[in-house]
């Protein structure tokens, strides 16, 4: 038996093993420099950059004591992708039998096969695509307005509804809010989608000025109700199509109890790869802030949680693919979860976290679930941080991976300082965002990101403890 003084000495000199070192800016920077290096080629899905990125994430998670939680006992969750790049096309329009000239530069088309033809098809105006009842779209080329009233389904869903109604081609009429040259340039770079996603045989874009000219030839206009038009169209559309498999990465930190429940952290690993043509001074979009920073934070949060006492619930760490193409990887996980979706008590997304200074208030995207809000508020207070309650960041809710999970009923949030100052965030979005100069350089701001990483560790401990937080029944945010 130890004498009292000797016991006191041992207690005072013993290391506090349950107190892991806080995450520092240098910890985040190490990962960002690697993931945003030119050797990773901009981390495009399906590229050599993907292999380097997913291998790196697996190594880092395994080194922190996590185990694989993907498909078939692996770290990976594969998903089938198709990439389409528009080629040449020919289009002929007639209104009441009279040819109507629409300039080639005023229409952009893509097919779901390498060559698609449409011969003397009827043209139907679909309005904004929200009132389709009573209109026959079978075999037709449908014109649909991109803009719709607030509360309408997203454009992607409205196009899907027209495809389900039998339209052979769907041409989206763009508004004047974004210049046509920018819209068509983005379209002609191509798109990426799930190989299983149904698309019209032919999809396309047309500026409002050209669509108005076409409808005027038929005695109609863009304000008309949905109806068949006295217009016929023939098309031949060529498209380059590339099918490949890309991967989410999924790891698990085992909890201390058999709760059958999971907390989920996620961050998208993908970016745009070679985003400029050959001969450009810098061809690679490295995505340092978007979103090597989020992946770096997720890795370090995994380490912080693994280094301390294990909370009762398991904690999953999901690095998603193809976020930049429409939350595809997160949507795939929501539709094909590697754990029962109802077992996920909350999902915390990490995206674009390296822009705010230390001391920034904490904003929350996805508030509205009382038990979750209370857990966040208590954690923020315990960390000596202050909440930003102006709700300006709510406009971003559908632009991040958490939205794919929230739609599936999982309580999904983003918590941090990078979107508490919308002016600061907008400066990034209007500058380096999705550009080759989003690099691991002196413009990275990581002291605020480190604060948010430590907040996420504390929040993770709270949310992974059933005694501190229980998911309410009835779905997500």
Sequence positions of predicted segments:
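Metal-dependent peptidase/peptidase-like ectodomains
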Residues: 192-193, 199-219, 258, 310, ...
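Soluble metallo-hydrolase cores and metallopeptidase-like ectodomains found primarily
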Residues: 105-134, 193-287, 300-303, 307, ...
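His/Asp/Glu-rich mid-to-C-terminal helical/loop segments that flank catalytic regions of hydrolases
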Residues: 303, 307, 424-477
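Second-shell loop/turn segments in exported
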Residues: 19-22, 38-48, 63, 78-80, ...
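Noncatalytic luminal/extracellular "stalk/propeptide" segments of secretory-pathway proteins
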Residues: 41-141, 148
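N-terminal hydrophobic or amphipathic helices/low-complexity stretches enriched
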Residues: 16-70, 182-183, 253-254, 473
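Extracellular/luminal Protease-associated
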Residues: 99-202, 259, 283-286, 390-391
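Extracytoplasmic/secreted proteins, especially bacterial periplasmic and envelope-associated proteins
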Residues: 23, 27-30, 34, 48, ...
